[in-house]
Amino acid sequence: MVSFKQVRVPLFTAIALVIVLLLAYFLPPRVRGGGRVAAAAITWVPKPNVEVWPVDPPPPVNFNKTAEQEYGDKEVKLPHWTPTLHTFQVPQNYTKANCTYCNTREYTFSYKGCCFYFTKKKHTWNGCFQACAELYPCTYFYGPTPDILPVVTRNLNAIESLWVGVYRVGEGNWTSLDGGTFKVYQIFGSHCTYVSKFSTVPVSHHECSFLKPCLCVSQRSNS
């Protein structure tokens, strides 16, 4: 019989053997049952590929289409808004004023024989017809023509926007109380428009009940 005193194991081998025994004891989970000890094996699973975007991205939205053309329904049901198409009619009581007046103390700017006003209070787009008509004598809700629009936007700061009187009824052309036809960057089936600091044409809005200042105008007298 060989005693342990007679067995000579190199120091490095002894240390390695101790480490292996410790790892075998502590690392694998121990499953006890029926007097046996089973070690659970560790299996490495490669990380699955995660696609951050579909292979075929969705087609872009055609903003020149109405909601009915785009989605086959006259109403677009989204969590926070539901625009209904082609329901707008010009209020009969609010038309272009046939008189002259200019409040030189309150106008925002004057240009080409007209006085322009940005209302101090905010209104819905439909409410701008009444707000402008009641602002001062001879004022009405104005749709800026291409020569007037740059002057309007220069008087806005970078975060401002305001409702303008460019609209359409049904599938008709975009127009205003002054008449004519307007080019509009349109979305869905909206009938209301606004402009901001960097607008080059009026832009239709998906929610005409938002509150914004209104663009009003009155003709100046020649005297």
Swiss-Prot record:
The chain crosses the membrane at residues 9-29. Changing F210A: Binds to HLA class II but unable to mediate fusion. One of its GO terms (molecular function) is carbohydrate binding. GO terms for cellular component: host cell membrane; membrane; virion membrane. Residues 1-8 are intravirion. Residues 111-217 form the C-type lectin domain. The keyword Ligase does not apply. Residues 30-223 are virion surface. The record marks G33, G34 as: Potential cleavage. It is a single-pass membrane protein. Disulfide bonds join C99-C138, C102-C115, C128-C214, C132-C216, C192-C208. It is found in: Virion membrane; Host membrane. Keywords: Disulfide bond, Host membrane, Host-virus interaction, Lectin, Membrane, Transmembrane, Transmembrane helix, Virion. InterPro entries: C-type_lectin-like/link_sf, CTDL_fold. Belongs to the epstein barr virus gp42 family. Forms a complex with gp25 and gp85 via its N-terminus; this complex is used for invasion of B-lymphocytes. Interacts with human HLA-DRA and HLA-DRB1. Plays a role in virion attachment to host B-lymphocytes, through binding to leukocyte antigen (HLA) class II and subsequently participates in fusion of the virion with host membranes. May act as a tropism switch that directs fusion with B-lymphocytes and inhibits fusion with epithelial cells. Additionally, hampers T-cell recognition via HLA class II molecules through steric hindrance of T-cell receptor-class II-peptide interaction. Soluble gp42 inhibits HLA class II-restricted antigen presentation to T-cells through binding to immature and mature HLA class II complexes. The C-lectin type domain is essential for virion-induced membrane fusion. This is Glycoprotein 42.
